[in-house]
Amino acid sequence: GISFILINLKQPKIDIKPIKLLSGQSPFCQVFFDDVIASESHRIADENDGWKVAKRLLEFERTMMADMGSEGAVDIEPIETFKTSDALSAPGQLNLLTKIKKHEMRNHLIDLTMTRTQIESKNGFSPAALSLKYISTEETQARWELNVASLGAGGLENVENSSGIKKEIAKSFFYSKAYTIAGGSSEVQLNIISKHILGLPS
């Protein structure tokens, strides 16, 4: 079975190496253990009940991801990028503007759904809550894709040497790729929805 144990990362023989992402940030690390000693007194819950603890922990992470918060992210709406960009042709602008408006409508629906689930959760279980992580993180990725598209064909060109809004959009675009993995991938979320909302077999 799997047990959940807390370990002091400051003890000897633990080597932590940050992983630099496309965004330039390093929120994830590789952790190497070389004959590290873990105390049984630091075990959470009973032996072999670690998966239960891990699943409960992931629920909190999914709630955080559903709220579309991310450390170091900037608040740039695609429509604002669109208005200040002159890199698009007239036909392209109309097509992109349509996509942006559809994104804004979906985002508004997500906000309404979050409010509804908060109210429902006070009275018990809210089925819609299980879908929030999936729909909100997918839409957040779409948001940054639209921001990049609004910059035109050279939106991601020479990002390393760029500055200002272009650099911030590029960083957030790359970082957003983690949203549909952290807290349970989109594929895992769809399995949860199919089992607990639709009642389909595992």
Kindly give the residue locations of the regions a language model identified.
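Glycine-rich beta->alpha junctions and the first turn(s) of the following alpha-helix
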Residues: 4, 13-109, 179
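Structural signal for hydrophobic packing residues in well-ordered secondary-structure cores
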Residues: 9, 37-40, 62, 83-86, ...
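Short, glycine-/Ser/Thr-/acidic-enriched flexible segments
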Residues: 10-12, 21, 37-38, 136, ...
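C-terminal helix-coil-helix/basic helical segment that borders enzyme active sites and/or dimer interfaces
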Residues: 91, 108-162
